[in-house]
């Protein structure tokens, strides 16, 4: 463990908590390792020894033990992170990498989710368009004739992690997206007209073996490198070298970006209002005939934008903080998003789906918020839609449970 000492001038607590004991003011602090320090207020200056760098690191002995289960072993170095931010680190990563991701949880203006996840320099890219699967690795690109779902399962099995207590819920794996058109890979009876589809892949996944995780609750971060379990002694050495490089990146000073006004061009749709209304009428007909329960009808909007997506995401996370925030670049495609909805979650053998039906704008005050909530929860149409979505989610979960 490396340590550093710094001065705390009188009146400057550096995050320590004042405690009154028999009329004397003390500064009382419990560090990450359970140690306690206390100083009387008469001292003009005190010195506090802070664990600046390494809090905990996976040893070779621990790695050998974990390797017995096969797959990949998460080699972890845990650091203090009270002076590092996810956005600051992302501003460094995006300068030298074109494949990365940032996943955050911002549940309100003043509330943060516990973990933020960052990954870069993936092992491979797996994508498909119209059932043609492409596998892109650091050695090159090739087409695969295997079924996409089988291919995904095989890679997940190869890099499966053992369960290690105390680690974040995600320590490496696939990050990317599945489009709505991906349903035709799972339901053979469904086929979509390729001429009506976008140019984006039906799914696009990056496999990350290196992940940085911020723990906002403990003010620490996890540097994680997944080492293949076979030949663990050699892969452990490489993992330590990768951790050293990741630590150097985390310690790199971050310059504040230059701010400027963004300009958004005219917004256009991929369909006319007449076509939109015509298709809505067709959907209503199918519902009345009993052919479908619901339809998620969408249109694509586009506009020019003179800033990069990172600048857009910085604004998005301030103006629309949500439970699920995302920024990712998959080579030639960039995605930024914000969503409050848990579409599907798998923890152990428990599947959770929490569809959202019905919305109201946020109130300007807490009282107005409560009134809008009351109106939403007693709206007959919203309740009917909610019950329908719960029923559909139950049916979907029932197919795989």
Where are these regions (language model features)?
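N-terminal amphipathic/hydrophobic targeting modules at extreme N-termini
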Residues: 1-18, 23-25, 35, 44
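Exposed boundary/loop context
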Residues: 4-8, 15-16, 27-28, 165-169, ...
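Generic N-terminal simple sequence motifs
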Residues: 13-14, 40, 70, 82
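Intrinsic-disorder-associated, low-complexity terminal segments enriched in Asp/Asn/His/Tyr and depleted
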Residues: 29-31, 36, 41
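Short, Lys/Arg-enriched N-terminal segments with co-localized hydrophobic residues
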Residues: 40-54
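Extended alpha-helical targeting/anchoring segments
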Residues: 52-401
């Amino acid at each position: 463990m490396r340590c550093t000492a710094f001065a705390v001038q009188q009146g400057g607590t550096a995050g320590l908590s004042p405690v009154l004991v028999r009329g004397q003011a003390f500064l009382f602090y419990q560090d990450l390792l359970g140690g306690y320090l206390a100083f009387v207020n008469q001292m003009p200056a005190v010195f506090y020894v802070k664990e600046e760098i390494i809090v905990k690191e996976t040893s070779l002995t621990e790695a050998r033990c974990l390797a017995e289960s096969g797959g990949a072993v998460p080699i972890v170095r845990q650091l203090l992170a009270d002076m590092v931010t996810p956005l600051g680190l992302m501003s460094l990563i995006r300068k030298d990498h074109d494949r990365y991701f940032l996943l955050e949880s911002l549940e309100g203006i003043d509330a943060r989710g516990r973990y933020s996840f960052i990954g870069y320099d993936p092992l491979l890219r797996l994508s498909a368009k119209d059932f043609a699967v492409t596998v892109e690795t650091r050695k090159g690109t090739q087409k695969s004739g295997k079924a996409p779902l089988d291919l995904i399962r095989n890679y997940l099995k190869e890099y499966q992690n053992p369960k290690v207590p105390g680690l974040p819920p995600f320590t490496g794996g696939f990050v990317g997206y599945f489009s709505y058109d991906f349903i035709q890979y799972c339901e053979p009876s469904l086929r979509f007209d390729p001429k009506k589809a976008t140019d984006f892949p039906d799914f696009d996944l990056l496999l990350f073996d290196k992940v940085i995780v911020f723990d906002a609750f403990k003010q620490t971060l996890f540097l994680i490198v997944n080492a293949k379990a076979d030949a663990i002694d050699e892969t452990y050495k490489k993992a330590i070298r990768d951790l050293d490089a990741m630590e150097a990146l985390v310690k790199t000073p971050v310059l504040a970006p230059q701010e400027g006004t963004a300009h958004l061009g005219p917004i256009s749709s991929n369909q006319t209002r007449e076509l939109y209304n015509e298709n809505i009428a067709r959907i209503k007909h199918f519902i009345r005939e009993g052919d479908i329960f619901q339809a998620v009808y969408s249109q694509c909007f586009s506009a020019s934008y003179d800033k990069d997506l990172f600048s857009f995401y910085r604004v998005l996370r301030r103006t629309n903080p949500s439970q699920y925030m995302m920024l990712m670049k998959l080579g030639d495609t960039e995605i930024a998003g914000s969503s409050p909805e848990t579409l599907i979650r798998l923890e152990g053998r428990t599947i959770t789906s929490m569809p959202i039906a019905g919305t109201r704008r946020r109130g300007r005050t807490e009282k107005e918020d409560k009134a809008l909530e009351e109106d939403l929860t007693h709206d007959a149409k919203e309740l009917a839609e909610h019950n329908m979505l719960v029923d559909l989610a139950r049916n979907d979960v029932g197919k795989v449970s």
